[in-house]
Amino acid sequence: MDYQQKPPQSSDPSPSPPDRPPGIRSPETPSNNQNNDIEDIMACVTALEAALLPCLPARELQAIDRSPHPSHQIDVERHARDFMEAAKKLQLYFMGLKREDRAPSRAESLKKDIAVMEEELKTKDELIKKHMRLFQESQKLVKEQIEKHRDELEKV
């Protein structure tokens, strides 16, 4: 029997760095550092895929040599597909982490600043109301004192 190591036949080809999976796209920011990080992650996943193809069939081929069942080749293809799916999930996970780690966009930072300013405005409004109430009470006390002094002056 001649066993050549070849990638499994799959209807879903593995993504290469230029062919990103659906939903994965470069960040909107033109930062070369972020693009390089994304390319590094994609290269890592591609390396995982490339590393599996020669190794897994070699192990499985030993089992095939011992057993003449045709189902072993199907097992090799199934293991390879499972690995490819895991590599894609890993890629998506790392891409999600990268999005979380990136700096917030201008719109996000402006929304955050607006929320902070609105909270500060509420606090200052409450302080102004409190001081206005205290000022009005002080005015009332001063008027009462003035009336009291006028009454005393009229008596004299």
Swiss-Prot record:
Gene name of this polypeptide: MED28
Subcellular localization, as worded in the UniProt entry: Nucleus
Coiled-coil region(s): 104-156
Transmembrane portions of the chain: none
Domain of life of the organism encoding this protein: Eukaryota
Keyword entries, A-Z: Coiled coil, Nucleus, Transcription, Transcription regulation
Any single biological process term in GO: regulation of leaf senescence
Protein name: Mediator of RNA polymerase II transcription subunit 28
Source organism phylogeny: Eukaryota, Viridiplantae, Streptophyta, Embryophyta, Tracheophyta
Entry-linked InterPro entries: MED28, Mediator_Med28
Disulfides per UniProt: none
Subunit record text: Dimers. Component of the Mediator complex. Interacts with GEBPL.
Family: Belongs to the Mediator complex subunit 28 family.
A cellular component term, taken from the record's GO annotations: mediator complex
Region annotated Disordered, chain positions: 1-38
Stated role: Component of the Mediator complex, a coactivator involved in the regulated transcription of nearly all RNA polymerase II-dependent genes. Mediator functions as a bridge to convey information from gene-specific regulatory proteins to the basal RNA polymerase II transcription machinery. The Mediator complex, having a compact conformation in its free form, is recruited to promoters by direct interactions with regulatory proteins and serves for the assembly of a functional pre-initiation complex with RNA polymerase II and the general transcription factors.
